[in-house]
Amino acid sequence: MQYSFTEKKRIRKSFAKRPIVHQVPFLLATQLESFSTFLQADVPGTQRKPEGLQAAFTSVFPIVSHNGFARLEFVSYALSSPAFNIKECQQRGLTYCSALRAKVRLVILDKESPNKPVVKEVKEQEVYMGEIPLMTPTGSFVINGTERVIVSQLHRSPGVFFEHDKGKTHSSGKLLFSARIIPYRGSWLDFEFDPKDILYFRVDRRRKMPVTILLKAIGLTPEQILANFFVFDNFTLMDEGAQLEFVPERLRGEVARFDITDRDGKVIVQKDKRINAKHIRDLEAAKTKFISVPEDYLLGRVLAKNVVDGDTGEVIASANDEVTESVLEKLREAGIKEIQTLYTNDLDQGPYISSTLRVDETTDKTAARIAIYRMMRPGEPPTEEAVEALFNRLFYSEEAYDLSKVGRMKFNRRVGRDEITGPMTLQDDDILATIKILVELRNGKGEVDDIDHLGNRRVRCVGELAENQFRAGLVRVERAVKERLGQAESENLMPHDLINSKPISSAIREFFGSSQLSQFMDQTNPLSEITHKRRVSALGPGGLTRERAGFEVRDVHPTHYGRVCPIETPEGPNIGLINSLALYAHLNEYGFLETPYRKVVDSKVTDQIDYLSAIEEGRYMIAQANAAIDENGQLVDELVSSREAGETMMVTPDRIQYMDVAPSQIVSVAASLIPFLEHDDANRALMGSNMQRQAVPCLRPEKPVVGTGIERTCAVDSGTTVQAFRGGVVDYVDAGRIVIRVNDDEAVAGEVGVDIYNLIKYTRSNQNTNINQRPIVKMGDKVSRGDVLADGASTDLGELALGQNMLIAFMPWNGYNFEDSILISEKVVADDRYTSIHIEELNVVARDTKLGPEEITRDISNLAEVQLGRLDESGIVYIGAEVEAGDVLVGKVTPKGETQLTPEEKLLRAIFGEKASDVKDTSLRVPSGMSGTVIDVQVFTREGIQRDKRAQQIIDDELKRYRLDLNDQLRIVEGDAFQRLARMLVGKVANGGPKKLAKGTKIDQAYLEDLDHYHWFDIRLADDEAAAQLEAIKNSIEEKRHQFDLAFEEKRKKLTQGDELPPGVLKMVKVYLAVKRRLQPGDKMAGRHGNKGVVSKIVPIEDMPYMADGRPADVVLNPLGVPSRMNVGQVLEVHLGWAAKGLGWRIGEMLQRQAKIEEMRSFLTKIYNDSGRKEDLESFTDDEILELAKNLREGVPFATPVFDGATEEEMGKMLDLAFPDDIAEQLGMNPSKNQVRLYDGRTGEMFERRVTLGYMHYLKLHHLVDDKMHARSTGPYSLVTQQPLGGKAQFGGQRFGEMEVWALEAYGASYVLQEMLTVKSDDVNGRTKVYENLVKGDHVIDAGMPESFNVLVKEIRSLGIDIDLDRN
């Protein structure tokens, strides 16, 4: 087994019983693949598939002018490289995007040409089509400097759907069936039955009309309509009664209305008897062809065809007419013998279309189309052209109607056609087929569709959503181009004069900036990033709304298995509408979710893996991943638990066709990080997976001792860690950069064989948490491709580490852990275990005002020297300064208008000159409740404005850093070149050279070492070929130097040009503060099992309960939090964590007494290879074993994968290994070694009972009391009510609400109540009076009229009631 460089350092012991058959796919693949298909940037123009941008262009172009003599054709498009890289865009508040240019061709035809069109002229040109935001390598977008994510949308797939109203519409509870044809874009077509069984259709939820109008409009006559929906009874008329053609199955189950006889007149079925199978057999035996029926059997029948008098050509009776006595009379008079009527019955052949035809008043195709026109455009006169145009545009025009590839495939599958391709518009037979199926449903044949089945819902990803927006923009452009194309020839216009890119840019900008699906990326920790990008939402444009979504849509559906996580979804109004993709889920070409399965042939599991969509899955019998298999892959059990079409059952192995790839296949990333998930109640697991996303990265991340084995995948795929692009040797490493000399076999010829990784240092995330990368390699380390070189936020040695491992005791402690409160030891705070750094960004802009420009300066009047001491000469705070609330960060003055001066001020101005008073201080100060250290300052200056010293210094530092990178690359390139050169020169014969090298001398190593490297090129070689090589190497080095100089120049140009700032802004300064947040009472914490709580008290270490060896617990939790919540996983995690730490302590003890490496090896083998997945420790060298042991002394990390975790027996073994009997006895453990004797820290007495003790991975959540705590002195008031505003953001007051007033009333505290409702709230005069009284030392309240009372009076007056105060 291959271990990567970092895995070797700390192997996670896995308890998995199943081998890994299928690696977890790259977690961000959905986003990245979708967007790259949209752009197709790396595909040459001619080879692009009709997807994404290419599809949008080809669907709109060519654009033809109204007169048809000019057309604009699309050739190809190209994307330029972005002007700024991702980091620069984030700093400058720009969008990371690329300019889109399309090559278009203007073709003008000759108007004078008499016969076929002749091309007069062709102009081809590249036209700018706006900017397209680019996706970062981690699947997000940088829009206006902030990272955003486009969430995928789960919407109803295009196609045809059949459903019923579940009996809710009509009081009788009758099922009303309906069908709906949903296109990808265009008008929806609905068909529905009403309670009277008449079939209607409606277009786009407009007024309903009988469906036969639509059938006539597509060109069917009433006869054809009936022929399509009914079978006919054939009658031959006699003088009295008639002969009915005998069709056996139409009679079965009917009640005979007369005696049925055979040819000889023998009665086979008596009148009023039900006809059964024996009767039918008798009739068939008697070779009955016709049955004689009496006259009244014909009455009430419905004619299937028009009946025409053969002699006169007159229509005697029309199709769909009822047969009456008069009609029969006419028929006999005309000598008509054969008639056909509709066969209907009450059971499975209803007369629905026939009754609908009766309701329909239109006569022919034209009348029907006019009726449809009147419904769509009420009030407009129906001219013939308008009627035709509207009808064709509804379903038959490619511009207005598009079923899409998916829609056509779904439609054809649903109506039972074999081919899955076809035209993208609706065809006449599509409409007919839909109505036929709907009528059959009403007749009781077939099933309605399940809307929530994942085969009926598809996912729209970034690429598709962006393409729709881009197409919408292009369509707007098309309209404008059509108008102008007419003038193209006369005014000699070029293509760029015709196309205005504004509509495209605005459509794209609106989508990425303010669409409901474009969300501010959740960047609290790496897990929250990954989850956000894997999210699937049913909300958004064209989706559901929270209010209208019912219970069914939100519920877990059997088809979610392996596609959408049944656990992870938000609590609250969005529950079930926002989901997360399952670990192995992936999208097929149609946008349906698929999940992988292993093929099973003859009850033997193969290695073939097939991805099945929800519809395909329904056809197979699928076993679960934990089915027992022998070493040959044969299914062992007699009965295997399996699923078919959403039902679970036990079947014999020979019926199994597929098997799950992994037990964790059904859950999402967040849920698969919860160890022992199988022992937790689903509601708590939901909370657990949601709360992991809120974990704040700690200062020193610590890997979870009990994990699930997904941690590494998660950390690496999120992009927080730094991975090696190519293998090589670490040449240089410091806190900020890693330089790797690439292996020769991986280096590309002619390119620099150097990879430089600049690490992210103390950068602010979207949620103000700190993103910081730390190298985990040393100089000289050999790394291979994909190895982790540096840890990021919340990662430890390349594994996700959201919290800290805490020693947890389950016991009550003086009521301090009542109701989920958490008691924490002071040691945890002292060791900075949960300390986190938060980075706040503060901005100030200097604008150009009417009265003159604002100025950023140090020269501010009335500012204390202490405040000025922190500012440099440009008026900007120094980096490293520690600041408190109210301190000045950037000095800024704004000119203020001339005011009327008081005599005192006039005197001051006379003495001190002009400057003092015509500006006001508008400096950037630290907001209330915030303090921290300044860690970075950025200054942006508009083009043409003089840079201050600070801005210049920042640019110089940046250039210095860049030069350092280039020098490193050059150093390594030159080093390699001179090594190659030395190998080539040694032993060659020289014709002469520096230091008096004689002709004919052989060059040796000593001579070369004595010379300066650059003088090697002066050696003249005898061998011409070698001399040419020497020249080539010299040229390549000079070429590289030249390239590096050019790159440096370009960087300098980019930095020294002015910054793009919003209009009217001259300068912008950003100051970054690092705020250190220690754990304190009021902070929210949680485990991974939904066990959340609030820190209630931080207890001195000497008061905490401790073990017999003096080790105190870190956290004390209430045992009552476990049973009722049913998240027992936390208890198992504590046991296994206890074993993990115990093993670590034993390894630490071995290292301390310097045990022999063999002893260490055998102990590690016992841990790793006695049960669960085996590890290949044989391949490790002694040094590697030693390094592994050093990393394990803090606890052996375990992996207990979801649904395939450690058993009780395995945990017992590990506990026995970790705590041999002597240690167990010393700690007073119980026989199963998971409970310990504890002593009270305050009295030293032993607790009566043993306590469950162990290690749990505990998280600090992003709900910090510091961010919520808030107090107000004087602040803003609401305009209307004059009451203080509410909330921390508005610097608001505390609300004294209705119930609080009741409390004071109940106490009878009348004066407190009075001041609360008047002077402390909205009595405007009273408020100012209080201040006056206090200044005068007179402590009296003059309470007046509260403003809200005046508002109430005004409201009542606005109702027309005159209310006035009697002021006597």
Swiss-Prot record:
Keywords, alphabetical: DNA-directed RNA polymerase, Nucleotidyltransferase, Transcription, Transferase
Pfam families in UniProt: RNA_pol_Rpb2_1, RNA_pol_Rpb2_2, RNA_pol_Rpb2_3, RNA_pol_Rpb2_45, RNA_pol_Rpb2_6, RNA_pol_Rpb2_7
An annotated GO cellular component: DNA-directed RNA polymerase complex
Catalysis performed (reactions): RNA(n) + a ribonucleoside 5'-triphosphate = RNA(n+1) + diphosphate
The keyword Transferase appears for this protein: yes
GO molecular function, one term: DNA binding
Quaternary structure, from the entry: The RNAP catalytic core consists of 2 alpha, 1 beta, 1 beta' and 1 omega subunit. When a sigma factor is associated with the core the holoenzyme is formed, which can initiate transcription.
Protein name per UniProt: DNA-directed RNA polymerase subunit beta
Annotated organism of origin: Burkholderia ambifaria (strain ATCC BAA-244 / DSM 16087 / CCUG 44356 / LMG 19182 / AMMD) (Burkholderia cepacia (strain AMMD))
Lineage of the organism: Bacteria, Pseudomonadati, Pseudomonadota, Betaproteobacteria, Burkholderiales
